[in-house]
Amino acid sequence: MTKFTKEQNQAINDYGKDILVSASAGSGKTTVLVERVLKRILSGTPVSSLLIITFTKAAAREMKERIKQKISDQIEKEPNNQFLRSQLLDVDTANISTIDSFCLDVIRRFYYVIDLDPQFSVLTDETQAELLKERALHEIEIEYLEKNDQDFQDFYDNFSGDRDAEGARNLLLQLYNTVVTEPNYEKFLNNLPNFYQVQDDLIESDLWQTQIKPLLIKEIKDLQTEIRQFFENPQMENPDLVKVKENYDIFTSRLEQFLNALEDDHSYNEIRASLMNCKFEKNIRKSKKWSEESLETYQESQKLKSDLNDQLKKIFANFFVVEEKEQVNILKKSEKLVKTIVDAEKKLIKRFGQLKREQNLIDYSDMEQFAFSILTTDTSNAHIAQEYYQEKFNEILIDEYQDVNALQENIIAAIKKKGQNNLFMVGDIKQSIYGFRQARPDLFLSKYHAYGQNDDSEKIVLSDNFRSTQRVTKTVNSLFNPILTANFGGIDYKKEGQLQFGATYYPTDLPTASEYIFTDKKQTQASFEENFGDEMDFSEIQMVIARIKQLKEENFQVWDRKTQLKRPLEYSDIAIITRTRSDNLQVMQEFAKADLPLFVTDAQNYFQTFELVMIMNYLRLIDNPQQDIPLVAVLRSPLFNFKEPELAQIRVKTRSGNFYNALTSFASVNSDLGQKCKNFLQQLESLRSFAATHRISELIWSIYERTHLLEIVTGLPNGQQRRVNLESLYERATSYESAGFKGLYQFISFIERMRKNQKDLAQPLLSDKADKAVKLMTIHASKGLEFPVVFVMGLGHKYQTRDLSGNFTISKDGLGLTIKEKDYRIDSLVKSLADVEKRQQMLEEEARILYVGLTRAQQKLILVASVSEMEAKQKKWESEIDQKTNILPLIRKINAQSPLDFLGPKLEQKHEFDQTIEDMTLALEEQDKIYYLKFAVQSDIEEKDEQKDDTQKLSSKMNDVVKTLYNFEYPFADATKTTAYQSVSEIKKVFNDPMDTELENSRLISSSNRYLQPIDETPVFLEKQKFTGAEIGTAMHLVLQYYDYQGDKTEINLEQEIEELVELGKLNPLMVPHLSKEALNWFVMSEFAAEFWQKPEKLHRESQFSSLVNASELFNDFSDSAAKILVHGTIDGYFETDEGLILFDYKTDFVDKTHEEQAIDKIKKKYTGQLRLYEQALNEISENKKVIGKYLILLDARKVVPVD
């Protein structure tokens, strides 16, 4: 007989109240649910009178099986109990299902209440659903255009580019996904414009008083708390630091003035001015005479100062970038647009519904909406459906309650009888990870904090973990104590969320040490990452493979709970868990090479696969061959095998114009390459003619036949899967045309929209070795599962924040818009507010996702990350956790860029982790550094030095070849158009003279189709070093960015500046020997910089800007001369004089001293376009003064060069 804990017994036996069970990972919540159901049945309650809602169909099936087993076990004890026998038969037809299945039952039973045809079918084909939605959107677009509706045109103009209407369409489609989870979507939509209602006095508006003001007050008070906690350090009373303290006193006084202006409702412009005054008066220098303690405290004060400045800059950028009059104008424009959007969204919902009804279809969102309407509709029989279910169900049990949305919450409330406390909810706020499905964890939190305060409700916390060894639970607790707090995640993990070790059945001699493996990315990989994005580093996969091999070789023992015996580790005991599935194919490839069995439970990232990118690029070419990026991608693909030297040869012959023209020109050359070009162009032209008279599906199949593409991909690794993927695209094209759609361009746009909206069309991965292989899955797919050994990979991956960088943000409360003005775009205050709130919500969910991943481990947890600049990261982490509270400050958490930003600070606390390097590193011949950390129980800690193992480095050339062949995050994924956003650092090379630029030296970034070229010849002082020229150049910029022109005008000052940057973690200490201090000192002592010393307050450095530039100035293949691109960049510096602004930019380009004049002239031409961009931007953002001079600071040549 199972022995339950006190809290589990409460969850099983307590009745008469609405009960919320907060069940941590591995706490046996399913067991408790099943036991509670059995107790109800044994007390005479039929299973048909219970409603049990699960999150997935698989969970519902498991629940039914476990209930049947429990009843069967009881029947063995009471063989004559006929009631139990009848209940055993009733379980299969009982209401144990997902919320969708329950809603479907409501609709089938009471369809007549909403006048629905009972012969409806459920629309399960996602592609068909998307196509119907596309048709609905297309029809309402036609309706607006036929009416020549100017408001609608203004809406489309604001959110779409000059070439298409995708921006506006995406807004409407994404808004649809949100509103259909609202219980009253019309009310939700009608309320959206209200956020923008404002009079001329912004401070009096509801938006300011109820939304922005409370947020800003909270943020400022959080900053004040950080300062106050820092000054609790007794060391701050040290006489050494008196000037530091005085500097902070001035700053805190200014911060208090800003807070008072906020709280006292000063005018917007006064509050803005007060914020602009919130800055530190001086840059206090340290002294070598200070004690070691004072120097350490000083460094901490400098880091805090930097953080405070950064946070205030964000507040300014979000809420005070323009003055009140302009803010009000933006809000009024936004309100008008939102009203148009609301009108269009209502039409879209209505028309989409009509199209479904015409085919007698309902989709999943209809199920919940229709069920809610049925349950709340006042018919002649007065809520007949609602009363039926209220009388039918004695109790409503809900699993995974943390993941319900607003509509589901209202459905549950509708079937709960008033005055009857019969609601039983089980969930864990720490495992709410479905925000993309509109899950509302705040609904769980509101009950969590309210239940138990009266006699009608009860809160039960299940914290005992029966899944994991003590080492695993200690690891998880140690890592999450600093992360999840009341102001981040809604729960104080240290007090209320910790796992309690309950799995006492494990033998004490099992190997259970948690491990953390760093692979230190080499600096030389930086340029590669620019091309291929933030994908998983190969070394991570190799580390995991090596560790798995070692575990097998050393006969690692696992505890088998079925046999209650130890046994050797099997591959199927191991799970590799990642945040996304984008790296699946790469992992599969490496495992295949290592001859290790691997089963992938998630479908791969379909749209990013090599074969899909290849065929989509070919379709883009057939639609329009005048596109350089897809053209080069197809030429380089295995279909045609053009090599880079061949492409360069083609470009050299025709240096101007697009690449298609160059290819056409070269086809006339009498050579093997000319014939190769001719053959390609003939096939392309033949396919274009074929496309004009045939269906899209026929075109796709014709490409397969003419290029033998199916045969080619079948011969590649994982070839059968690739073939299935290509056949799937053919099937989708057939479905597209069957739905009445036509046109190749439209089909490409449809597929692209599905890709961006993550509507993956992937086919299940083919495998027959699931039971004998290592499992690879995403964290989402792993939820609810457990494995003896778990590797959590990709912890260095950057979080995706694209949703916050677009032109609109949809939140649970509103719709934030970016407004297009004549020469720029600007976020409305509603957009800025939504971005701030959504960013924190996103990061809170990322922390919860991390928790889910780590708690899958039963016996051994291994965390894996590849990290660049490891030493600098470690130095940064050392001081991040507040030493008094042992909490990671909120400011750090809301600025987290990756999981490592959450975990690193705690991992760096050496008193909790035993840091060793073991002999596993001998199996890794291709790594440079490995940080291998074992978790140690507090009482077992011994001080040990961290060891580092320098081994042979992977050949960069071979690495590039392998990655090019098997990199499935294809570098030309967005081939039909460039991004609407470019950085100056990326486009500056476009201004180069074509004679100076060979195609073979050009690169294109996959994420946004941006131009990049490698740095030109390296200056003398940068040569033959560990770091690349670009990296050293960046470091030189960094020193000049922070150089203090109020200090001593000596070389010692420069040394102190560099030392301070290292101590702040801004500059890698290994970089220091490679800096050209002579060049740096030349500039700061130069005649040009003399005025900086006299008037340092007039010097502005690292000034960011955004500016609209004609796309045709940057890209040859932009046929639309009116097309514009938003360019974002950072100006190295400018200086204010009485006459105007002096603009300057540092360059570390090599200058050939033997031909200095010609070399400087070449560099000048190279960067003239860039500086003109800067000039344009600076003139736009400067109200009173214009640029009167532009200069290049050539550090290698020690020259200041004027630019026209």
Curated annotation (Swiss-Prot):
Gene Ontology biological process terms in this record: double-strand break repair via homologous recombination
Keywords: ATP-binding, DNA damage, DNA repair, DNA-binding, Exonuclease, Helicase, Hydrolase, Isomerase, Nuclease, Nucleotide-binding
Record carries keyword ATP-binding: yes
Keyword Glycoprotein: no
Catalytic activity: Couples ATP hydrolysis with the unwinding of duplex DNA by translocating in the 3'-5' direction; ATP + H2O = ADP + phosphate + H(+)
GO molecular function: 3'-5' DNA helicase activity; 3'-5' exonuclease activity; ATP binding; ATP hydrolysis activity; double-stranded DNA binding
Record-annotated UvrD-like helicase ATP-binding domain positions: 2-469
Superkingdom of the source species: Bacteria
Gene Ontology cellular component annotations, sorted alphabetically: cytosol; DNA helicase complex
Xref: InterPro entries: AddA, DNA_helicase_UvrD-like_C, DNA_helicase_UvrD/REP, P-loop_NTPase, PDDEXK-like_dom_sf, PDDEXK_AddAB-type, Restrct_endonuc-II-like, UvrD-like_ATP-bd
UniProt-listed Enzyme Commission number(s): 3.1.-.-, 5.6.2.4
Residues in UvrD-like helicase C-terminal domain copies: 496-784
Stored Pfam families: PDDEXK_1, UvrD-helicase, UvrD_C
UniProt cross-references to Gene3D superfamilies, sorted A to Z: 3.90.320.10, P-loop containing nucleotide triphosphate hydrolases
Cofactors (names): Mg(2+)
Quaternary structure (record): Heterodimer of AddA and AddB/RexB.
Similarity remark: Belongs to the helicase family. AddA subfamily.
Task of the protein: The heterodimer acts as both an ATP-dependent DNA helicase and an ATP-dependent, dual-direction single-stranded exonuclease. Recognizes the chi site generating a DNA molecule suitable for the initiation of homologous recombination. The AddA nuclease domain is required for chi fragment generation; this subunit has the helicase and 3' -> 5' nuclease activities.
Name this protein carries in UniProt: ATP-dependent helicase/nuclease subunit A
Species per Swiss-Prot/TrEMBL record: Lactobacillus johnsonii (strain CNCM I-12250 / La1 / NCC 533)
